[in-house]
Amino acid sequence: MQNDQGEIVDVYIPRKCSATNNILAAKDHASVQINMAEIDPQTGRMTGKQITYALCGELRRMGEADDSVNRLAMKDKMLSEVFGH
């Protein structure tokens, strides 16, 4: 398919799980997408930076979603390292 500038683009780009890197199937109704916003410590307001994490249903079913979000947030410096220990 071509866009209005004549560039070839894909119609569908599948999402991947941020923790396991598995492709999220269309029928994976247990998968979720979480947006985390950075907060300014002085004002308590959002700075405008946000990161999106997609988690597959298999990860949630195993009960590993919370650990995965914490690990991803620490890697992206959205959560302090002290929280992990």
Curated annotation (Swiss-Prot):
Disulfide bonds: none
GO molecular function: structural constituent of ribosome
Subunit details: Component of the 40S small ribosomal subunit.
PANTHER family linked to this entry: 40S RIBOSOMAL PROTEIN S21
One annotated Gene Ontology cellular component of this protein: rough endoplasmic reticulum
Primary site of residence: cytoplasm
Name the UniProt record assigns to this protein: Small ribosomal subunit protein eS21
Organism: Pectinaria gouldii (Trumpet worm)
Subcellular location field: Cytoplasm, Cytosol; Cytoplasm; Rough endoplasmic reticulum
Keyword Ribonucleoprotein: yes
Keyword Calcium: no
Top-level taxon of origin: Eukaryota
Keywords of the record: Cytoplasm, Endoplasmic reticulum, Ribonucleoprotein, Ribosomal protein
Pfam families linked to this entry: Ribosomal_S21e
Family indicated by similarity: Belongs to the eukaryotic ribosomal protein eS21 family.
Residues that span the membrane, as ranges: none
Swiss-Prot/TrEMBL GO biological process terms: translation
